[in-house]
Amino acid sequence: MTKPRIVAIDDEVEFIDVLENYFGLRGYGINVAVRGAKGIEIVKEKMPDVVLMDLKMPGIDGDEVLKLFKSMTPSPKVIFITAYDDGGKTKARLLKMGAYACLDKPVSSLKELEETVNKAASN
């Protein structure tokens, strides 16, 4: 089975390093960005299967980026990973808008994240 292609966008460099190492060592094609605008460029260029993205980053609106990614053909599956908590309202809205999943940060299990990525890519 071919591993999904991933783009990870997060302004926390340490978290990006963890994702890049974890998925890279397991044979996934992964590109990373610590700035939202650069991440959008990479997604447009690489056309990944899955985008892992923080919701709250300087100069970037998760809702708008999700709309942009959903308008692409083929459209990548977007998995938000965020520490932002407003009682689940934002997560519910993003899921309704077409996000594949909204996960809590810190990520409790990279293995579970990997399973979510694989499920997203196979849908």
Features from the language model and the residues they span:
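Hydrophobic/aromatic residues positioned on beta-strands within the core alpha/beta folds
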Residues: 81-82
